[in-house]
């Protein structure tokens, strides 16, 4: 994806730009810059004539506008400044980015940062603008998609009329790195599963290690069997594609400092196994590696930002397929932790691969905290829809930090409870636990299952089943929750 050159310059000359982006409030009111550039009369006239009512998300491009030395003037509606919400502001940013992408703009002055929702500051506005405009250039390109002439964005640079303070520069750098990380996450998740296999994910990690200097270690099937990863290997045994345990290490702090661990579910295609899923929309089960794609997207951002902390990634990756040798309902397997699991439903496979990954992460890296992420339960979509991801954990301060970063980036999490009362649903007559707990509280019982493997570490679980991709005519991966996780990690420094 092409990278925009973002700049901070408090003293701007309109003659230096071919496009000016201007926020407009209802009643045609605009910013101080508009008044100084004698544009207030123009926006007021357009409002009075009913040509531009400045509703949130409304845009209008004017060419060769009078009184200013720009080829284009992009008006962006913001509604009532007293009631402008974060949601409304971001809708306006996305609309502006789309309008700009459909124009010939090359060198842009962006004044949308002069219009900020209540309880936010200029650095926040710069972050959100940078994220929105950089993300708008994303276009899925792969050999599986026969596009003769891929669109080449014209936009080269965007300047904010703001001081180049440390806080503002951090906002630009963090947002752009997050957007580029999201693009990698989207590329991996959007890729057909016959291309994006566990081997492909491992090769991607190896390429990233070469680019950014990460340490990389790929565990193969024979090695994992010898180690005793009976739960992970049980899921993998029905697939022809070999499973991988993909491990990346980023060291930005002293080696003695315990790392933060990110663990991502990497089921590159989930049929449900013997407990076969319905055929409708099964193509979307290529997105069941959204947790793995998110972890790699976060590491893409880390490689660009080079923060002063240590982070490790562990990605268990496999397909979940029906076969003559696939696991069956009623089978009992022994996990790496030594705990046994009765498999009542082979479509609850994510927790089976994650539990061994969580144990391996603790044994190998001794992390200060673990955050795992997975497209784990359909119950999460029923509970929270597609607006927020679920977060559960055994350390409230860790959960609070994730929620705070989600709120700051508007890549939000909603905390759901963990309680020993839910353990009753995981009881088995034939093993230490069952891998499902029935229909009730499905997201919670899935996390309650994982909690049995994280008792000795500060741990949080993110269920991103409702946020990792969208269906319908705009089907595709979202890149979430890369922005929130990047912010969370930077806040740990």
Swiss-Prot record:
GO terms for biological process: proteolysis. Mn(2+) 1 binds at residues 270, 347, 349. Binds 2 manganese ions per subunit. It is found in: Cytoplasm. One of its GO terms (cellular component) is cytoplasm. One of its GO terms (molecular function) is metalloaminopeptidase activity. The active site is at residues 277, 351. The keyword Metal-binding applies. Mn(2+) 2 binds at residues 265, 270, 288, 349. It is an enzyme of class 3 (hydrolase). The keyword Translocase does not apply. Pfam families: Peptidase_M17 (PF00883), Peptidase_M17_N (PF02789). Keywords: Aminopeptidase, Cytoplasm, Hydrolase, Manganese, Metal-binding, Protease. Its cofactor is Mn(2+). Its EC number is 3.4.11.1, 3.4.11.10. It catalyses: Release of an N-terminal amino acid, Xaa-|-Yaa-, in which Xaa is preferably Leu, but may be other amino acids including Pro although not Arg or Lys, and Yaa may be Pro. Amino acid amides and methyl esters are also readily hydrolyzed, but rates on arylamides are exceedingly low; Release of an N-terminal amino acid, preferentially leucine, but not glutamic or aspartic acids. Coiled coil: none annotated. InterPro entries: Leucine_aapep/pepB (IPR011356), Macro_dom-like (IPR043472), Peptidase_M17_C (IPR000819), Peptidase_M17_leu_NH2_pept (IPR023042), Peptidase_M17_N (IPR008283). PANTHER family: CYTOSOL AMINOPEPTIDASE (PTHR11963:SF23), LEUCINE AMINOPEPTIDASE-RELATED (PTHR11963). Belongs to the peptidase M17 family. Presumably involved in the processing and regular turnover of intracellular proteins. Catalyzes the removal of unsubstituted N-terminal amino acids from various peptides. This is Probable cytosol aminopeptidase. It comes from Hydrogenovibrio crunogenus (strain DSM 25203 / XCL-2).
């Amino acid at each position: 994806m092409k990278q925009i050159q973002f700049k901070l310059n408090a003293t701007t000359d309109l003659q230096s730009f071919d496009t000016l982006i201007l926020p407009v409030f209802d009643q045609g009111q605009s910013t101080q810059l508009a008044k100084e550039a004698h544009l207030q009369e123009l926006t007021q006239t357009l409002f009075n004539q009913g040509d531009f009512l400045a509703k949130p998300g409304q845009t209008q491009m004017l060419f060769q506008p009078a009184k200013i030395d720009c080829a284009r003037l992009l008006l962006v509606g913001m509604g009532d400044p007293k009631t402008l919400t974060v949601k409304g502001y971001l809708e306006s940013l996305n609309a502006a980015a789309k309008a700009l992408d459909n124009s010939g703009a090359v060198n842009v002055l962006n004044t949308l940062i002069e219009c900020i929702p209540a309880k936010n500051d200029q650095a926040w506005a710069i972050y959100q603008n940078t994220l929105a405009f950089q993300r708008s250039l994303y276009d899925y390109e792969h050999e599986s998609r026969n596009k003769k002439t891929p669109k080449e964005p014209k936009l080269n640079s965007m300047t904010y009329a703001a001081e180049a303070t440390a806080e503002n520069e951090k906002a630009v750098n963090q947002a752009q790195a997050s957007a580029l990380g999201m693009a990698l996450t989207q590329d991996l998740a959007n890729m057909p599963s016959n291309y994006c296999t566990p081997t492909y994910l491992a090769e991607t990690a190896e390429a990233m290690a070469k680019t950014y200097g990460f340490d990389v270690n790929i565990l193969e099937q024979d090695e994992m069997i010898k180690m005793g990863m009976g739960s992970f290997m049980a899921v993998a045994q029905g697939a022809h594609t070999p499973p991988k345990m993909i491990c990346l290490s980023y060291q930005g702090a002293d080696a003695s400092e315990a790392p933060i661990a990110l663990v991502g579910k990497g089921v590159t295609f989930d049929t449900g196994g013997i407990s076969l899923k319905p055929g409708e929309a099964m193509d979307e089960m290529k997105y069941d590696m959204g947790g793995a794609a998110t972890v790699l997207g976060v590491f893409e951002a880390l490689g660009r930002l080079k923060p002063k902390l240590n982070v490790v990634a562990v990605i268990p990756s496999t397909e979940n397929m029906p076969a003559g040798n696939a696991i069956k309902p009623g089978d009992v397997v022994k996990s790496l932790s030594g705990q046994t699991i009765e498999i009542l439903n082979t479509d609850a496979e994510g927790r089976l691969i994650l539990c061994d990954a969580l144990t391996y992460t603790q044994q190998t890296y001794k992390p200060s905290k673990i955050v795992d992420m997975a497209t784990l339960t359909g119950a999460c979509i029923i509970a929270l829809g597609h607006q927020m991801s679920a977060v559960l954990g055994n350390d409230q301060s860790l959960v609070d930090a994730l929620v705070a970063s989600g709120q700051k980036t508007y890549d939000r999490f909603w905390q759901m409870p963990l309680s020993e009362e839910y353990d009753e649903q995981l009881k088995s007559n034939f093993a230490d636990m069952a891998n499902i707990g029935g229909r009730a509280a499905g997201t919670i019982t899935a996390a309650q299952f994982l909690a049995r493997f994280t008792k000795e570490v500060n741990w949080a679980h993110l269920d991103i089943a409702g946020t990792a991709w969208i269906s319908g005519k705009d089907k595709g991966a979202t890149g979430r929750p890369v922005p929130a996780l990047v912010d969370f990690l930077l806040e740990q420094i």
